[in-house]
Amino acid sequence: MSETAPAPAAEAAPAAAPAPAKAAAKKPKKAAGGAKARKPAGPSVTELITKAVSASKERKGLSLAALKKALAAGGYDVEKNNSRIKLGLKSLVSKGTLVQTKGTGASGSFRLSKKPGEVKEKAPKKKASAAKPKKPAAKKPAAAAKKPKKAVAVKKSPKKAKKPAASATKKSAKSPKKVTKAVKPKKAVAAKSPAKAKAVKPKAAKPKAAKPKAAKAKKAAAKKK
């Protein structure tokens, strides 16, 4: 009988072991609940900065000191979160939501950009304008092709040089006419020769005078009969 009694005690020991495992499983849930409690309840630093800058009516932008005052008035702890404010300003400037009008880094004045959408649209236009200079490069070969035409125009210029030679020949051809005009007085000499012919005509009239002699001879022959 004494040998069989320890068996139930051995079975009770393993049954008590699963209880710590359940407690370990419950602990992660508590840790998750602690993580939820750490999340800040409210807007982020960047949202607070953008609201404060948009609320300001200054044309030159909101300074860092004025921004801290606006955040402190909204219940934000500026002294503890000073580094977060500076990082938030730098990130907003890099994204393009804010424009830094004065100063460098986190110090200076800031204002909202006019329209974030317009900034994105202007960037592609600049790329298109950068692509436009490639077109003039294509036009340059055409201009180079037009240059040989100018060389052809230079070849045509000798024709102009030939024209003066032709005009010189025409002038030389016209010059004999002037010589002929100088020879015209010879025609006047030829015109005098008809006058001599007129002087010869009276000689031809002498045979007419011979006719009366023939008539006298006929009369003499008639008398002899």
From Swiss-Prot:
Bias (Basic residues) ranges: 123-138, 146-163, 171-189, 198-225
Residue ranges constituting the H15 domain according to the UniProt record: 41-114
Keyword set includes Repeat: no
One GO-annotated biological process of the protein: nucleosome assembly
Compositional bias segments (type: Low complexity): 1-23, 31-43
Region of interest: Disordered: 1-46, 94-225
Domain of life: Eukaryota
Predominant location: nucleus
A Pfam family reported for this protein in Swiss-Prot or TrEMBL: Linker_histone
Keywords associated with the record: Acetylation, Chromosome, DNA-binding, Nucleus
Compartments in which it is found: Nucleus; Chromosome
Modified residues (N-acetylserine): 2
MF terms (GO), sorted A to Z: double-stranded DNA binding; nucleosomal DNA binding; structural constituent of chromatin
SUPFAM superfamilies (UniProt xref): Winged helix' DNA-binding domain
GO cellular component, as recorded: nucleosome; nucleus
Protein family per UniProt: Belongs to the histone H1/H5 family.
Function: Histones H1 are necessary for the condensation of nucleosome chains into higher-order structures.
Official protein name in the record: Histone H1.11L
